[in-house]
């Protein structure tokens, strides 16, 4: 299990509690998180060139589940913020292409906002069984939703 943008660590705690006991769990974020037993946390930027190698060094096999709840710091400009989240999701997709095993799952935050058309086409090339989920806790007017899909 790999969590990109893992701070503050909530999804890692859920993965540890509900994931298979044999799962290796790794979280990566720019920010340091509190230690969680049996979870590897790496303080790193996902845009660093060596990120895929670092991920591969932490797993003996490809990853079965890649999670990402990343969101950029808000600039106050909805268009800029939307482009930033698209950039994050594109990077998550690039990483998933190399580290996610066939039939592995990707769960990623995505924001609706108009500029995601090209991104959706890229997603359809790499992934299948694409579903969208809006948590009940998310405000109705919020563009936040989640993408759940399987790697081809």
Report residues per predicted region.
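A short glycine-rich, Lys/Arg-flanked "PGG" loop and its adjoining helix->strand segment in the class I
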Residues: 86-102
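Short strand-turn motif at the edge of the Rossmann-like AdoMet-binding core
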Residues: 30, 70-71, 109-112, 135-136
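Glycine/threonine-rich flexible loop motifs
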Residues: 74-85
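Class I S-adenosyl-L-methionine
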Residues: 112-152
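Short glycine-dipeptide loop
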Residues: 21-22, 100-105
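Conserved SAM-binding loop of SAM-dependent methyltransferases across substrates and taxa
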Residues: 8-21
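S-adenosyl-L-methionine
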Residues: 28-75
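Conserved class I S-adenosyl-L-methionine
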Residues: 1-7
């Amino acid at each position: 299990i790999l969590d990109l943008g893992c701070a503050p660590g909530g999804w890692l705690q859920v993965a540890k509690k509900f994931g298979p006991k044999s799962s290796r769990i790794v979280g990566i974020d720019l920010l340091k998180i509190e230690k969680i037993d049996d979870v590897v946390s790496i303080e790193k930027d996902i845009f660093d060139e060596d990120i895929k190698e670092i991920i591969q060094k932490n797993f003996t096999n490809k990853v079965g589940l890649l999670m990402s709840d990343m969101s950029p710091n808000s600039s106050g400009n909805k268009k800029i913020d939307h482009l930033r989240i698209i950039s994050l999701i594109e990077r998550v997709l690039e990483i998933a292409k190399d580290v996610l095993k066939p039939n592995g799952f990707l769960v990623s935050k995505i924001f609706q906002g108009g500029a995601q058309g090209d991104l959706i086409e890229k997603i359809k090339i790499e992934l299948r069984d694409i579903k969208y989920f809006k948590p009940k806790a998310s405000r109705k007017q919020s563009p936040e939703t989640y993408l759940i899909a399987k790697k081809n």
